[in-house]
UniProtKB/Swiss-Prot annotation:
GO terms for molecular function: transcription coactivator activity. This is Mediator of RNA polymerase II transcription subunit 31. Belongs to the Mediator complex subunit 31 family. GO terms for cellular component: core mediator complex; mediator complex. The keyword Magnesium does not apply. GO terms for biological process: DNA repair; meiotic gene conversion; positive regulation of transcription elongation by RNA polymerase II; positive regulation of transcription initiation by RNA polymerase II; regulation of transcription by RNA polymerase II; RNA polymerase II preinitiation complex assembly. The keyword Transmembrane does not apply. It comes from Eremothecium gossypii (strain ATCC 10895 / CBS 109.51 / FGSC 9923 / NRRL Y-1056) (Yeast). The gene is SOH1. Component of the Mediator complex. Component of the Mediator complex, a coactivator involved in the regulated transcription of nearly all RNA polymerase II-dependent genes. Mediator functions as a bridge to convey information from gene-specific regulatory proteins to the basal RNA polymerase II transcription machinery. Mediator is recruited to promoters by direct interactions with regulatory proteins and serves as a scaffold for the assembly of a functional preinitiation complex with RNA polymerase II and the general transcription factors. It is found in: Nucleus.
């Protein structure tokens, strides 16, 4: 057997494989908000909180807080985090450069309070 394979690199087959639906993608993202370290990563490493499109997207995702969508949520704490993020970003305004201002403390608050919120979430689950 030679060191180099004559087979092409792995490429997913388009036959029979479907991309996730918008519903599935949005559900997965909303539920990922229950993971405080992930939220911290998003906010601090990517500075995504400064993007007005992110603010609009989070606001749009609030429909998950309403029936009938809540029945699909496995990690209900994600809705708490979604509302928390939106409450911070509601105060932010877009400057002339297209960057949100007024929510500069958001990453720091998530970093400092995130551990406590995770503990509170666990306690609610035990409750």
């Amino acid at each position: 057997m030679s060191a180099k394979s004559s087979e092409p690199p792995f490429e997913p087959s388009s036959e029979g494989e479907q991309l996730p639906s918008r519903f599935e993608v949005e559900l997965e993202f909303v539920q990922s908000l229950a993971n405080i370290p992930y939220v911290t990563f998003l906010l601090t490493q990517h500075q995504i909180w400064q993007d007005p499109r992110f603010k609009a997207y989070l606001k749009y995702l609030e429909y998950w807080c309403e029936p009938p969508y809540t029945q699909f949520i496995v990690y209900p704490n994600c809705l708490f985090v979604l509302k928390l993020l939106n409450s911070f970003l509601d105060k932010a305004v877009e400057n002339e450069d297209g960057i949100l201002e007024g929510a500069e403390d958001l990453p720091k608050v998530i970093q400092m309070q995130g551990g406590e919120w995770m503990n509170q979430m666990v306690e609610r689950w035990r409750g």
